[in-house]
Amino acid sequence: MKLSLLSLATLASAASLQRRSDFCGQWDTATAGDFTLYNDLWGESAGTGSQCTGVDSYSGDTIAWHTSWSWSGGSSSVKSYVNAALTFTPTQLNCISSIPTTWKWSYSGSSIVADVAYDTFLAETASGSSKYEIMVWLAALGGAGPISSTGSTIATPTIAGVNWKLYSGPNGDTTVYSFVADSTTESFSGDLNDFFTYLVDNEGVSDELYLTTLEAGTEPFTGSNAKLTVSEYSISIE
């Protein structure tokens, strides 16, 4: 079998991603195709611990990755949001037909308090500040909870075959909507655009807003010897 120079280069690139050592710096990143994997330890000063992250493989529009951590102290504070972010041109919601995604993951460790969630942002202009943050929680582990003005759900929609509790609350000037799965969902496949459509139809969110950010990762509060393994993650905007 003959391989072109491009194919050989692609294989070499994939191999280099697989061999790369984990990275542990507060703002370290790795790029894999259209994904950037962020070791975003933005809240590390709220507690004591460490977190390291690495790419396991990348092929086409699918990435596999992991992050390992131990955090203590500041039990009510998020320590990080290690995530895989898609690189794309900000796009108005009314120009998006679908956002197909698949996410398969598992967690191990002790006394884990964390979420596993998509995190997305909407703005009035392509480069403007965020008006809304939309989160989709596939898991709320150990009692982790979303931002909420009242602590109560505002709706209980069924989207992509999963039952969700919807919460809303402010984070500075940004309104946060969080869809929290009724039960831990370690294998999710659906259209993320359905969540935006729900908010447009039911919560008065404008479909003229720009989708500016698409991320998927975990927010740990506390736990020890924890490891999130993402065996498959893909997402695209159509």
From Swiss-Prot:
Known SUPFAM superfamilies for this protein?
A: Concanavalin A-like lectins/glucanases
* Major location (coarse): secreted
Compartment annotation: Secreted
Recorded GO terms, molecular function? cellulase activity; xyloglucan-specific endo-beta-1,4-glucanase activity
- What EC number(s) has UniProt assigned to this enzyme? 3.2.1.151
- Enzyme class of the recorded protein, top EC level: hydrolase
Please provide one cellular component term from the Gene Ontology annotations of this protein. Answer: extracellular region
| Reaction(s) catalysed (UniProt annotation) | xyloglucan + H2O = xyloglucan oligosaccharides
- Signal sequence, start to end: 1-14
What's known about how pH impacts activity here?
A: Optimum pH is 3.4. Stability declines sharply below pH 2.8 and above pH 5.0.
Q: What does this protein do?
A: Catalyzes endohydrolysis of 1,4-beta-D-glucosidic linkages in xyloglucan with retention of the beta-configuration of the glycosyl residues. Specific for xyloglucan and does not hydrolyze other cell wall components.
Q: Which family does it belong to?
A: Belongs to the glycosyl hydrolase 12 (cellulase H) family.
Q: What is this protein called?
A: Xyloglucan-specific endo-beta-1,4-glucanase A
- Name the source organism: Aspergillus aculeatus
Kindly list the organism's lineage.
Eukaryota, Fungi, Dikarya, Ascomycota, Pezizomycotina
